Amino acid sequence: MKILLANPRGFCAGVDRAITIVKNALHKFGAPVYVRHEVVHNKYVVDELKAMGAIFVDELDEIPDGNTVIFSAHGVPKRVREEARKRGLQVFDATCPLVTKVHMEVHRASRKGQEVVLIGHKGHPEVEGTLGQYDENGTGMYLVEDANQVDSLPVQQPEKVSFVTQTTLSVDETRDIIDALREHFPAIQGPRKDDICYATQNRQDAVRALAPQVDVMLVVGSKNSSNSNRLRELAERLGTRAYLLDDASQLQDEWFTNVNSVGVTAGASAPEVLVQSVIDRLYQLGGSKLEQMDGVIEDTVFEVPVELRV
């Protein structure tokens, strides 16, 4: 059974930065360091940081006064920043800079009195953070999850509306919604540069190239990872049986009955050690040849805050 590895895969610059912020804060200040929400959506990473002394909370009221808090890579609503400021918490912001870019787009649009449509998945932390950037004196911001919802959007000023997208969606699913928005609101304005992040795009392109070449596609990533789910869905849309798994322990022997080739990739929040564990298990299940696919070389680096550089 041939094993083909997608490239690029795994950690992106935003995830790497967020994890480094937590680790460096623990090194500088000692445990505990509080983190609002999972800093990235990966069980292995979160468990590792917990073991080092990080405490993950849902809201700031779970954090005692005088402590350090880190905002996750997904970003937070303005009200959370204001609450932290009022309480005097020491804040380090691990929001991915590409998410911050979307936040600024929403902020600018609301200040201009524009209504804003956010393309994203309800309940995802990034979506909640982005919705929370809209000024209260603005006219309105709306979440849309599929093209069928566009006709029922309660937009009041169709000549003054813009759209933004969650950064971890697939290009395919946003394309249909954007087309519907442009048809329904001809004057709608979009971002100057696509909001889908470079790492999400690169990993999807790698799966798009690899999936048709294999019998089974494995995506290493956690169930609550948006970009990992999109990779699995993309492979399935291309006609390849695909599975999302946290680690090698979730591999099932029957997946590989009469399988001659298997593709492996990883979501942007999944560490390479988990990919390697999957490869090791595939060898035990009959894997005999490992091949690295060609792909985009990523050299983007996002700096951590000055106070946490070591």
Curated annotation (Swiss-Prot):
Binding-site list for dimethylallyl diphosphate: H41, H74, H124, S225, S226, N227, S269
Record: residues binding (2E)-4-hydroxy-3-methylbut-2-enyl diphosphate: H41, H74, H124, T167, S225, S226, N227, S269
Keyword Oxidoreductase: yes
Highest rank taxon of the organism: Bacteria
Active site per UniProt: E126
Pfam families: LYTB (PF02401)
Enzyme nomenclature, EC number: 1.17.7.4
Keywords from the UniProt entry: 4Fe-4S, Iron, Iron-sulfur, Isoprene biosynthesis, Metal-binding, Oxidoreductase
Keyword Ligase: no
Co-factor(s): [4Fe-4S] cluster
Cofactor note (record): Binds 1 [4Fe-4S] cluster per subunit.
PANTHER family linked to this entry: 4-HYDROXY-3-METHYLBUT-2-ENYL DIPHOSPHATE REDUCTASE
Entry's family note: Belongs to the IspH family.
Protein name: 4-hydroxy-3-methylbut-2-enyl diphosphate reductase
Organism ancestry: Bacteria, Pseudomonadati, Pseudomonadota, Gammaproteobacteria, Aeromonadales
